[in-house]
Amino acid sequence: MKKVLTIAGSDCSGGAGIQADLKTMMAHKVYGMSAITSLTAQNTTGVYGISDVTPDFLANELECIFDDIFPDAVKIGMVSNSELIRTIADKLKKYKPKNIVLDPVMVSTSGSRLLEEEASASLINILMPLADIITPNIPEAEVLSSMKISKSEDMVEAAKVISDKLDGRTAVLVKGGHDLNTANDLLYCDERAVWFEGERINNDNTHGTGCTLSSAIACNLAMGNDMASAVENAKKYISGALKDGLNLGKGSGPLNHAFWLDINR
């Protein structure tokens, strides 16, 4: 059985963070493990509290995993301060896992900054160069490329700029999402731009979509798929999870990560 590690925050409501990651991993029939960076008190209506773990505790978590059940892929999500980012980078350099997927949780889809400047700089300069693929949304891609993205051509140019900053070693998946009124995503890998068309699904319950997509990519890479195939398969999975129409909570609810298990019985 393939093994996948998620390094991210905990969502007590189960829709995002490591809970969404582990559900995605189970649906893909891989063995999921988690190293928690922070505890969050949140639900479908908002985030009401965040408590980070200490760098020493995160280091202990990562060592316990890497020294015992070595992962075939690693997904990195919410990391809210520079010390934790440096801790993760140190362990990745020490253990050298393959198939690192980084969801750079820097800016919300509404444009709100989620990281302080120091933490953003650490994420960009220390952690991103270690990743095999990063999955920014449009606002995050704008920050990383220092350009405004208002049309599809801008997504391609921004992805090239980001890739060049990372010396072309890291694939860049720019997620179209709500910002361009399209569900199409752009993968820039090995100096090639590949579009993945997505179906616009009429469902306001999108809590945890970014976490789920990056985890599904990690699962597919762990199973031996190439980068383009991993992204394509992950897109299909998240579309199905949205289409299932799960409706929980008073706000933007979660996806049905388990729909895949029903299909693949």
Q: What is each PLM-predicted segment?
A:
Residues 2-6, 18, 26-109, 113, ...:
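Conserved N-terminal subdomain of the carbohydrate kinase-like
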Residues 7-13, 194-207:
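Short pre-catalytic strand/loop immediately N-terminal to key active-site residues, enriched for Gly-Thr
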Residues 19, 142-143, 203-227:
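Short, small-residue alpha-helix embedded
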Residues 29-33, 194, 220-234:
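Phosphate-handling active-site elements
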Residues 52, 228-265:
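Charged C-terminal helix
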Residues 86-95, 192, 223, 228-229:
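Nucleotide and nucleotide-moiety/phosphate-recognizing core
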Residues 117-193:
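Conserved phosphate/ATP/ADP-binding segment of small-molecule kinases
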